[in-house]
Amino acid sequence: MATLKANERTDFKRSTLRKIRHSGHVPGIIYGKEITNTPVSLDSVELLKTLRDEGKNTIITIDVNGNQQSVMVTDLQTDPLKNELTHADFQVVNMSEELEAEVPIQLTGEAKGVKDGGVIQQPLHELSIKAKPKDIPQTINVDISGLEMNDVLTIADLTADGNYTFTNDPEEVVASILPPKQEAFEEDAEPSPGEEPEGENQ
């Protein structure tokens, strides 16, 4: 579990927030059940590195002036023009209580339908699960090797490979295999030998 040091914020002026960001830090808020919200600032590079190395659902220990709390990042705000992290939300978690999380899907295997020329469609890229913090995976592998042409894989077809449960609608589609699109020239049949194409009669 990564540990990040943070400083408590007491000045909320816009000019102060700009100074925080210009110094390479990001303002944030720590919140949770039965605790007082705590505005903080922390090193943005260290935060992004932790999330990149360990995944967005990793549990982080935040040390605010010696007071340590286990948290998860629930929201990151960025400035698209500057490509800069502007704010982060941290939820305090109870390691013995279940919580909900969104986990990225990783499709594995090559579907039989794709080998036959089909096209895979993936309308769902994250799964909603409920689990204790330590049991939340960083990705969930979904094997599609058995899917044939026109097959549809739904949440109901999945089996959890860890200590978590899916909270999505069971009928929600994860992936499907569609037949290949016919080329335009195949749809417009060529004239038979000896048959004059329409519009060329003199």
Curated annotation (Swiss-Prot):
<keyword id="KW-0689">Ribosomal protein</keyword>
<dbReference type="InterPro" id="IPR011035">
    <property type="entry name" value="Ribosomal_bL25/Gln-tRNA_synth"/>
</dbReference>
<protein>
    <recommendedName>
        <fullName>Large ribosomal subunit protein bL25</fullName>
    </recommendedName>
</protein>
<dbReference type="InterPro" id="IPR001021">
    <property type="entry name" value="Ribosomal_bL25_long"/>
</dbReference>
<comment type="subunit">
    <text>Part of the 50S ribosomal subunit; part of the 5S rRNA/L5/L18/L25 subcomplex. Contacts the 5S rRNA. Binds to the 5S rRNA independently of L5 and L18.</text>
</comment>
<dbReference type="InterPro" id="IPR020057">
    <property type="entry name" value="Ribosomal_bL25_b-dom"/>
</dbReference>
<feature type="region of interest" description="Disordered">
    <location>
        <begin position="180"/>
        <end position="202"/>
    </location>
</feature>
<dbReference type="GO" id="GO:0008097">
    <property type="term" value="F:5S rRNA binding"/>
</dbReference>
<dbReference type="InterPro" id="IPR037121">
    <property type="entry name" value="Ribosomal_bL25_C"/>
</dbReference>
<feature type="compositionally biased region" description="Acidic residues">
    <location>
        <begin position="185"/>
        <end position="202"/>
    </location>
</feature>
<keyword id="KW-0687">Ribonucleoprotein</keyword>
<dbReference type="Pfam" id="PF01386">
    <property type="entry name" value="Ribosomal_L25p"/>
</dbReference>
<comment type="function">
    <text>This is one of the proteins that binds to the 5S RNA in the ribosome where it forms part of the central protuberance.</text>
</comment>
<dbReference type="GO" id="GO:0003735">
    <property type="term" value="F:structural constituent of ribosome"/>
</dbReference>
<dbReference type="InterPro" id="IPR020056">
    <property type="entry name" value="Rbsml_bL25/Gln-tRNA_synth_N"/>
</dbReference>
<dbReference type="GO" id="GO:0022625">
    <property type="term" value="C:cytosolic large ribosomal subunit"/>
</dbReference>
<keyword id="KW-0694">RNA-binding</keyword>
<keyword id="KW-0699">rRNA-binding</keyword>
<dbReference type="GO" id="GO:0006412">
    <property type="term" value="P:translation"/>
</dbReference>
<dbReference type="InterPro" id="IPR029751">
    <property type="entry name" value="Ribosomal_L25_dom"/>
</dbReference>
<comment type="similarity">
    <text>Belongs to the bacterial ribosomal protein bL25 family. CTC subfamily.</text>
</comment>
<dbReference type="Pfam" id="PF14693">
    <property type="entry name" value="Ribosomal_TL5_C"/>
</dbReference>
<dbReference type="InterPro" id="IPR020930">
    <property type="entry name" value="Ribosomal_uL5_bac-type"/>
</dbReference>
